[in-house]
């Protein structure tokens, strides 16, 4: 009977220690990279008031964020451009022959 009590006591002690360690780690753990903070404020070109931020972004032609996206997508598009893509003529899928450009008879 004495061994049963000591083994249960050890199990309970281990569980309590694990619980304490887990709670300490979860409280002190930093936010992950993908997690958003609970409260954050977006500044649009240095304006700090929220009401002014909205009107400023609605009145401006492009917000700084949309300009960043445009530049980013342009760079991506330029890296995928094939200069001779329109000149290549492969086999026809319709069965009418090769992809040649017909020349008008004179």
Swiss-Prot record:
Compartments, as annotated in UniProt: Cell membrane; Secreted, Extracellular space, Apoplast
Signal sequence coordinates: 1-26
UniProt KW Cell membrane keyword: yes
Induction annotation: Accumulates upon infection by generalist herbivores such as Spodoptera littoralis. Induced by wounding.
A GO MF term: receptor serine/threonine kinase binding
Any one of the GO CC terms: plasma membrane
Positions occupied by motif SxS motif essential for MIK2 binding: 64-66, 92-94
Region span, Disordered: 46-106
Biased composition (Basic and acidic residues): 46-56, 65-77
Short sequence motif named SCOOP motif 2, residue ranges: 86-100
Known tissue expression: Mostly expressed in roots, and, to a lower extent, in seedlings shoots.
GO biological process: response to herbivore; response to insect; response to wounding
Keywords: Apoplast, Cell membrane, Cleavage on pair of basic residues, Membrane, Secreted, Signal
Keyword Signal: yes
Motif (SCOOP motif 1): 58-72
Family: Belongs to the serine rich endogenous peptide (SCOOP) phytocytokine family.
Subunit structure: Interacts with MIK2 (via extracellular leucine-rich repeat domain); this interaction triggers the formation of complex between MIK2 and the BAK1/SERK3 and SERK4 coreceptors, and subsequent BAK1 activation by phosphorylation.
Protein function: Brassicaceae-specific phytocytokine (plant endogenous peptide released into the apoplast) perceived by MIK2 in a BAK1/SERK3 and SERK4 coreceptors-dependent manner, that modulates various physiological and antimicrobial processes including growth prevention and reactive oxygen species (ROS) response regulation.
Protein name: Serine rich endogenous peptide 7
Source species of the chain: Arabidopsis thaliana
GN (gene name): PROSCOOP7
């Amino acid at each position: 009977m004495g061994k049963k009590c000591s083994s249960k006591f050890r199990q309970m002690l281990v569980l309590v220690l694990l619980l304490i360690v887990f709670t300490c780690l979860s409280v002190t753990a930093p936010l992950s990279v993908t997690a958003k903070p609970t409260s954050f404020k977006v500044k649009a070109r240095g304006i700090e008031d929220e009401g002014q931020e909205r009107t400023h972004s609605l009145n401006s032609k492009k917000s700084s964020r949309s300009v960043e996206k445009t530049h980013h997508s342009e760079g991506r598009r330029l890296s995928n451009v094939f200069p001779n893509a329109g000149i290549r003529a492969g086999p026809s899928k319709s069965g009418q022959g090769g992809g040649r450009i017909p020349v008008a008879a004179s």
